[in-house]
Every structure is written in C-alpha cells, then in structure tokens.
Amino acid sequence: MLKVNYLFGCPNCNGSISVDRLHAGIPCETCLPGAVEKLDIRTIYDLLVKYSTLKGYSELYMDLEMYDDILRLFKKIVGGEPWSLQRYWLNKLVRGESFSLSAPTGVGKTTTLIVYSVYSHTTSLFVVPTKSLRDQICEKLKKIGHLVSCNKPEEDKVNVVTFHSINKNIDEFVRIKPKLLMVDDADMILKSGKTTERIAKVLQIPQEVFDDTIKMLRLKRMLRFKEDEDLINQVRELESKILGYKSSVQFIVSSATLKPKGYKQMALRFLVGFEPSTIQIYNRNVIDSFTYSNNVNELVKEIGDVGGLILVSKDYGKKYVDQITDNLNAEGYRAMKAISGRKFLEKFSNGDVDFLVGSASYYGVAVRGIDEPKRLKYVIFYGVPKTKLPLEDSLNNPLTALKIGELLKLDVTEYRKRLIYLSPAELQAVKIALRNKVSLNGKLGDLVEDLTKLKDIILDTIKANKIDKLVSDSFVIKKDTNKHYIFFPDIITYIQGSGRSSRIMNGGLTLGLSVVLVDDLELFDILNKKLRRIAEVTFMNFDELKLDEVREKLNKSRSDGSGGRSMNFKTALLVVESPTKARTISKIFGRGVRREIYGIPVYETIIIDDHSNTIIYTNIIASKGHLTDLTTEELGYYGVEINDKDIVVNYSPLYRCMSCGKTITKKVSTCPYCGSSMINSSEKIVNAIRLISTEVDEVYIATDPDQEGEKIAYDIYSLISPYNQNIFRISYNEITKTAVLNAIKSKAKINESLVKAQIARRIEDRWIGFELSSVLRSALNDNNNGTGRVQGPVLKWVVGKTSEYKANIGYVVDINIGDYVVRKFFKTKKDAETFISQLNVKVTKIAERTSTIDPLPPFTTDSLLIDAYSKFRINSSLAMKVAQELFEAGLITYHRTDSIHISPYGISIAREYLEKIGSNDFVGRSWGNEGAHEAIRPTRSMDVEELRKEIEENPFQFGIKFTWAHYRLYDLIFRRFIGSQMSSATATYTTYEININGELYTVELPTKVHGGFSSIYGIRVYNLDESHLTTRIRKGSLVSLLTYADVIRLMKDTNIGRPSTYVRTVQSLIRHGYVVESKKRSFLIATNKGQKVYEILNKYFSDMVSESRTSHLITKIDKINRNELSAEDVIMDLLNEIKNIKLVNPLQSEQYV
C-alpha cells in the first residue's frame, strides 16, 4: 500500500508524521501512541498531558480555551451567538493579533470590539471620530459594568476618546501605556502624518525605529530608479535594526477607506505588519437609473419620499451644493449640507433632516462617511460624477498625452514604444518630472524632454485647429471660457456613492435607488460602458420606472428586512500557487488589503456570491509552488521505504538558499552548494497557512488544475487537517470573477488518483535520475551531471541532429523568387558561386484551383510554443513564462493543456467580439469533447489594441510588467481563438513549375485568401514574381538543427512529453551543460559534454532511455491518473528496472574517456 510520510508537521512536536494521522487531526505516534482515530482537541490535549509529551499542541489548546471564554462573554453581553465574521475577529483578537476589521456597517464591528475590550482586562484605548460615538460606547460599557473612562486617560480602564483628544493630549495617553489600541475611522491616521506619528507613540514604537523605517522606505524608493551597492547595504543595515523591534501593543483598525500613502503612514504599516486600511466592498442592491432633467426638486417630488442624498459633481463647485440645499429648504423640505464633520449624519439619522447634499468626491464625507441603512434610500447625482482638470496639467500624464495625440492624428508610435515597457516606478518618475518641470538622467531624461515637446505640439495643434471638443473612449476635452479642460467620469465615486443607499441591515442588503442627472451625454456614455464591464451595472431610464413599486420596495427592505436581499456571511482561506495570482484575485473582488504573517504576504478581500447572497471574507495566500519534495535524507531508497506491505514515501520541506537560489530537500544549517547560512524553509509558509486555517470557516485550495497542482493541494490539505477539517479543492481554468465563484460553488475533494500518479512520476524521476546521474558523475568526474528518462530521448535527438549538421556543413544558396525561397546546398563556396553566376530562373503557372480552408483549432500548449517560435522567434522558455504571467493576470485561460475544447462561455466571448467589430463570420465551435481543461483562449473579448489602451489608462491593474513578448503572445492567442470561431476562408491555390538552371520543381502554393477567419488569423500567401529575384550565399548545412519547437513536436508525436514537461525537459539539459541554445535563432546544439553523456547512456542504458520505454511509462502514469492502474505496481516495476542500472557499473569494467 502506498503511504505518505512527512518528516515535519506533527502539530505537537513538529517531527515526522504519517498522512493518516494528519488527516485524523492527531499528533505523531511518538507523541500519541495508539490507533489512528479522530479525536477532539481537548481529548488530544489530555492524552498528551497523560503521556508527558505535550509540546506545541498546548498553543492550539490554549487558543481554543480563550476563544470559548470570549464566546461565553459575547453571548452574555450581546444575548446571542456571534456571526461568522464576528467569530473570525474574536479568534484573532484573543490570540493578540493586530489587524484591520473589514466589513460594511451593520455586521457588529463595534460590538465585537466592546466585548473584546471587556475581555482583555487591560489598559486600552478606543479612538473614535465623534463625541456622540464616544458617548454611545461609554454608555454601553457602563451598562456592562466595566471600568471605563471617557474624559481623561486612566490606567486599567477602557479609555474611549476622540481623535481631537488624542491630538490635544498625546503625552497623557502615551503615559498610560495602553496594551490595546482600537481605532475607528482610521482615515484620520491615514490623512494626517502628524496623527500617524502620534499613534506610533501610543503604540510605544521608539522614535528611532520609526525614523529608521521612514529612512529605509525612502532608500528603497531610490533603488527603484538605480542600482547602487551603497544604498543596498544601507537598506540591509536599517532592516536588521528594524526587524529586531516587536510591538507589545495590540493594534486594531476599523472603518478605513484610504490607502496609506505618505512615508509616515507607510512606516506605520511596515512596523505593525498590516495595512491600516479596510477592504472596500462594492456589493450593491441598487436600481441604477438616469434622466436628462436637471431639476432636483421636481425629481424629489416624483420619487415621493424623503431620505435622499444629493451628490453634486465636483466641477459645479460648492456654490451648487448651497443652491440645491437652499432650493430644497425653500420647497419645505429639511435639507442639510454634508461637507465636513459628523453633525449632519446625527441629524439625518435622528430624523431631523430629510435630505443631505454634498460633493461627489471620492474623498468627501458624503461619499465615504455615510452609513445610514434605515433612512438613506436613494442617491441623486447632480451631473455625471466626474473629474475636471486643466488640459495642460493632464498632459503631465504621458499615457493621457498619448491618447490625446492619437485623437489629434499625431504620430505617437515612437512615444508609445518607449512608454509601454516602463516599470510602474519609472512611469511615476516621468509623471513627477513633467509635473514639477525637473530633469532626469539617462533614458528617462531624454523621454521627459521629448514628452515636454509633445505637450507643446498637442496644445499648439488644438489652438491652430480651433478645436472646442474632443471625445475619446475614456474622457472628453471641452473648451470653457477660453481654456481647455479634460473630463473623466468618476467610476469609483459612482459605485461608492450610489452604494450608500444599499447597506447591510438585519442580515440583509437594503434596496437602493440611484438617479444620474445627465449633463454630458458623451461622459455618461463612457461611465455607462465602464460600469457595465467593471461592476455589471445596467442603467434604466428613470421615466420608465414604476415609482410606486420602487418606493414600496425601498421602504419594505428597511422595515422588516423582507424586501431586502438576505445576506449570509462566511470566512475562508484561499490558497493559490503564486503571489501574482493572489494579488489578481484580491483585485477582481474589490480593493483588498495586505497583511503579513511570519513575513508571508496575505491578501484580504471580500468575495460576494450574488446568486446565493453570500459574503465570503477571504484571506488569500500563495504557496509559491511546492511546499514539500521527496526527501534526500538517508531514508530507504532515495527517500522511499519499501517493506512487505507498504511503500512509504517520505517528504521534507523545501529549504531555499537565499544566496544562490538552490533548493535543498533535507535539513541543513548551511547551503551545500555555496556555504551560505541564509536558508529559508517552506515550513514558514505552512505555518502561516495553518494559522489562518484555525481562524476561518472553510479552506479552499486553488492550486493549478494539473498533476503538480493536485500534489501541492494534497500536501496543503494534509498539513492543515489538524487545524481545520472543512478543506476543499477548487479549480478554475481562468482567473476571472465568474470562474472563481463557479469554482467555489463546485468545491470538491482532492483527486487522489492524480496525487498517486504524481508520486509515482516523482519517484521514477528521482530513482532513474539519481542512479544515472551517479554513473555520469563518476564517469565524467563532474558534479553538475543529471538526467532522467525523458531527457534521454531528447538528448539523443539533439546530439543526433548536431552530429548530422556538422557532418553536412557547406554552403547554402537562397534563391528568393518574389517572397518564395528555394534553397540549394553545395559542399564548397566555389560551387555555390559558380551556380549563381550561371543562374537562370523561369517560373510558369500551370494550374489554379479554388478551395475552402477551415480555421485551425485554438492553441494547446505545444501548438502555442511552436507558433510563438515560428512566427516571432519567442523561444519556448520565454513563451511559457509569458503565458504563465498572462494567466495569472487573468487575461488567458490555463496555459498547460492538451485540450482544444472551448466552453459555451468561451464561445460567447468570440461572438461578443465579432459583433463588436461588425463581423458576420461568427460560427461558434466547441472543438471536441469537454475535459478537465479548455484550450488556451482569452478571458475577455478584448483584442491587443484594447489591451494596450487599458494598460495606458491603468498601468498597474494587471500586476505584471508588460513587454513586447506579452503583447505578441496575447495577440497570437487572441487571433487564433477568434479565428477558430469563424467561418471558413476561401483560398486560391496556384501550381507553378520552377526551372532553375535546368532543374524542374513543381509547387502548389496559396496565392489568394479572403473571407471568413482569414480577416483575423491570416494565412501566408505567396507571389512568385521572377522579376524580383535575389540570391544569397551563406554558410549552412544540408541538415537543420533542432529548435525548441521541433523538440516539442517530437515529444508530442512520440508521446514522451506533457504540457508541463515540454520546456522543463530542455531547460534541464541546458542547465547541466549538455545543450546550448544559439543566440540568433534559438537552435539547440549539443556540447561535447552532452555528446559524452549520450554515448554513456546509449552504450549501457539505451533501452531504459529509449522513446518507446519512456512513452510506455508515461502511458502508465496516465492510467494511474484515470484510476486504471495501481501506483504501487508501477513503483515496484520501476524498482526492478532500477536494479539493472545498479548491476551495470561501467566504471568497474572500463574507464570512460
């Protein structure tokens, strides 16, 4: 029986433990002798105490005890059970964690903090924005009978104070040395550097540490623009000083909407280990509408109810806020301005005010600071919410300048080429230099000079052509009182502002109404299109609404909750493979926040499933690939112990050397390769995942949907099972909102057949590789030798072609007849020259026919790699790296696939795109049967030019730095996919007879192609024009060398490769020095070392590394995948095969030279 054993991970001693025990949630046999059975935490604790083996498990037990204590207290104070989100917070609070409480109003943040402040029995500080909120909290604490101070700082009490008090009496609050600091509305910290510094003092952060952190952050920013060894050393020295600091104060942040931007704010974030900001939730239950009226009073009469928020577009200014407020009051309504402070909200909540009027500004209190679910029913936008800038100022953003230049028909191609590949830091430096009119050095300096000239050209062109208005797909430029301004629709302000009418109340989401008074048709059209794509908002004409029904629903959703949308809350941990993927998922569900656990980044976001009305508070962490590997400790046969009954496979954590980058699979204190003591263990990531798993309701493991991804998922599942039993495997083929939500809905268990197949393949790789490598090291006296079963045939092909190439070197004459090339080979240069001197070419058209051509299917991994090389000379390692990044950025589907199938959703993307460009050639093809994966396709109906525009508008949205290769590969994938969903093309094939110096050649070539898919995915056509005849002599061979593309095609044809191994196999040969890749054309050439290795393998182990034997083994692995073959049988067959290697030791019989 196949069994897995980890050499670490016991929840008590962190020692060796079997998978069976981990899955049962119990410690190792040394700690807890006896049969494997599921036991609860308290029983396990008691048994460990009984056996005197209690170690680390005590922490798990104590956390549970503290959690139970605070649950009892919560029920006593509140009179009911905490919600899922409150349980999550309480769990973290009792463990002393510092973090942000992210949730909409109405889910009990303040209640949770009041309960915890009572539970903590320590000097604490509760900082709130207003006196009224301070008084409310004080009153609640007094009713509970807890020690509370509301007027002056006192030790051993809960001190409830306003920010004003903190700023006024900072020294007194520092003096009481609170152990717990809770901050409501932390925007007060984030807006003011002075307040941030005062909060740092309350947190007892030494001034020197705070100043050093600011200095370190400044130096790191400088390093973005230039590599400087002195700066790097300064940063390292500061980091070593700062990292020794650990705060003794627990810091909790609630209700923050801003991101920390200043150096003081960023320093605070660095020192407390989390972002003092909270997740922005864009969940809405809103009727979005528009009208062309501009009369607010008339609109209010039509709605027929009070409880409205009027947001005035910023370009109208404070004057219109005053005017609208006065007009409403004159009509007999009670209206009040919402400009600053909090009094307006108190009056509105108490029913003393009917309407609030404020500015449609993202940072304004009317958009950010109003949470009144019962009374606020609708939002009226006076004018399309927009940002207005002087045109000249907007040109300091070079990407905006490019778009305006294009609108003016200026040639900005060269500017685009230089800008599009800048890093975010470089682009920011250029913006700042243009805005402040300062110079930069090097290429950025030249770019700033040229962009300054472009600004002048744009302004002169607009003036010379007397242009009053320009409209693009993202902004409008208009002339206003002899000056030009640029207007952008404010998408986020609309989402946030309209969302004020739809809040959490009594466990449900209230219904809201939004009405935009359209003052600019073009801007509204841009707003409408962007909202439809980003937030799935659809606007209705206000005049077509049945207002009596709307009014009834608005009120009903607030009276008894029955008319609102009922919401469920859940907490989860989502484990992915890469940090980029973690950031992408965090972004697509709103604006998340980042914290660190044991130095590992964790992204917090809120996933909202509208269909089940579930809010999933989600922590996202990256495993960074595999967390374990077959151990190289001296255990069994290369880590595998075999006895009569079982095959026990032993796994170690991965130890990565921070100096040389090597990975080690046994416990070491120094790197065996470079001697460095800077070793990082994957145990740190395991511990971070374990910690979060204790806090959440469910764990979703979303590693890649392939064999390797399943093994990573299995390791995570096994190692965290003692901490959470609600663990699910989810998988998706693309990183989009819909795909992730569907994956969560379809959560499943680990596919153990895939895991067993991976284990068998890894054992084969280890056994064959280590044994053959041992022979090669001895034979060649070189430690950098290694090979495996798949590398053997590939090395054979490369060595063979290299030998044939060298044996047939001569001269090649290229005869270019129009755009068709005929090649002739000669042994000597003289023969080639003679041939050219006598050259006589005659081309005769002898036949022509018309035929239809069907489109090619969408890409699989092998066909993508082949086309990337043949069309753009992108070698396969770069192509796979770029495809990985495009997948992780959410732009294409999973790129390791041998399926050509397209899902109905994929087909709809092609339909949408073809309709958008006005094509009638959509056909729609599913291309084969549905399987685990789809073909490689785009995730949106966005071509490469649209992608460029998106990146120009927001260079940071995809989280990767785009290069020419990213655009080329995306364009290739997009065109191939769209073409695969189109009708057939019509081609004309022409047959030619070519007479070259008396030799006759007959060829049939496509000479015309039109219609169908050819408009998107072009087919090469030829023009054999003998009047355009050129020749060239070059050194070459009768035999071509192999490229990556050739090797991939051979691997696929001989069934010795899979999408995940195509590139890795060749890279391994290059890494060992057996093969080199030519610089110009990426040919693969065998080295002398590679030749010697092949000769040894061919002489002694030819059968073992043959194509047929390798293909046979891969077929067996596939059968294990499908549960048609036992992994144990395959492993035992391998063991018998390995014995042949050990029996044949070439060094004992002869010395290889």
UniProtKB/Swiss-Prot annotation:
Catalytic reactions on record: ATP + H2O = ADP + phosphate + H(+)
Helicase ATP-binding domain segment(s): 90-276
Region annotation Topoisomerase I: where it falls in the sequence: 567-1153
Any Pfam family hit: zf_Rg
Claim: Transport is one of the keywords in the record: no
Motif (DEAD box): 184-187
Cofactor(s) this protein requires: Zn(2+); Mg(2+)
Residues binding Zn(2+) 2, per UniProt: C657, C660, C671, C674
Annotated Toprim domain residues: 571-735
A Gene Ontology cellular-component term: cytoplasm
Induction cue: Transcription is strongly induced at the G1/S transition.
UniProt cross-references to SMART domains, sorted A to Z: DEXDc (SM00487), TOP1Ac (SM00437), TOP1Bc (SM00436), TOPRIM (SM00493)
UniProt remark on cofactor binding: Binds 2 zinc ions per subunit.
Zinc finger intervals, RG C-terminal-type: 654-681
Active site annotation, chain numbering: Y894 (o-(5'-phospho-dna)-tyrosine intermediate)
Other remarks in the entry: This enzyme is the only unique feature of hyperthermophilic bacteria/archaea known and seems to be essential for adaptation to life at high temperatures. It may play a role in stabilization of DNA at high temperatures.
Family stated for the protein in its record: In the N-terminal section; belongs to the DEAD box helicase family. DDVD subfamily. In the C-terminal section; belongs to the type IA topoisomerase family.
UniProt-recorded name of the protein: Reverse gyrase 2
Lineage of origin: Archaea, Thermoproteota, Thermoprotei, Sulfolobales, Sulfolobaceae
